[in-house]
Amino acid sequence: MTDEPVKVVNKWDGPTVKNALDEVVKKILNDKVGWTESHNLMNLRLLISFIGVAFSAFACGYDYYEPFPKSKIVLAVCSVSYFICMGILQMYQWYVEKDCIYEATEVDGKQSRKWAWSSEIKAHDDKYTLSAEFKKEGRSGQGKITKSIGAYIDNDGEIIVPLVKKEVDDLYNRLIRSEQ
């Protein structure tokens, strides 16, 4: 990864800054040798969404071939099923995904660690919290760093990648040391 600054559109917009910092963290972690990113969380989210949309598409298609009075039951069942799928999707995002931005497996010789990285910026706050958690053969560890976004972004609204990389590496090294 190049150490060029990444431009942020509006440094006062919390969600934009969080997304930009998350992308930088993902790029840094993807560049680590021996890491394989896992897309299981996103794949399950897509599957739940696809099932909900499939119910909607079936309802539209069925209504096209069997106009409304005959299709009333199918439309009702498909509509309720769609909203149930969207409720499941929302619960999945709240309780399973949480704020996870990156999942990966690190293979180190014969051992492997499963990593989950998450981030958070509270509304109307300038504190960016980066959390990491790993699991390996019954052992686990977790840690986090909380700093002002001003530590990573200059006055022009550019993310200073080397500073973010240093924080990510420090958090990673701290967790690896605590494991041993």
From Swiss-Prot:
Membrane topology term: Multi-pass membrane protein
Domain of life: Eukaryota
Cytoplasmic side of membrane: 1-45, 94-180
Keyword Endoplasmic reticulum: yes
GO terms for cellular component: sarcoplasmic reticulum; signal peptidase complex
All ranges on the Lumenal side of the membrane: 67-72
Transmembrane segments: 46-66, 73-93
Keywords of this entry: Endoplasmic reticulum, Membrane, Transmembrane, Transmembrane helix
Protein location: Endoplasmic reticulum membrane
GO biological process: IRE1-mediated unfolded protein response; protein targeting to ER; signal peptide processing
Functional description taken from the UniProt entry: Component of the signal peptidase complex (SPC) which catalyzes the cleavage of N-terminal signal sequences from nascent proteins as they are translocated into the lumen of the endoplasmic reticulum. Enhances the enzymatic activity of SPC and facilitates the interactions between different components of the translocation site.
Family, similarity comment: Belongs to the SPCS2 family.
Subunit structure: Component of the signal peptidase complex (SPC) composed of a catalytic subunit sec-11 and three accessory subunits spcs-1, spcs-2 and spcs-3. The complex induces a local thinning of the ER membrane which is used to measure the length of the signal peptide (SP) h-region of protein substrates. This ensures the selectivity of the complex towards h-regions shorter than 18-20 amino acids.
Protein name: Signal peptidase complex subunit 2
Origin organism lineage: Eukaryota, Metazoa, Ecdysozoa, Nematoda, Chromadorea
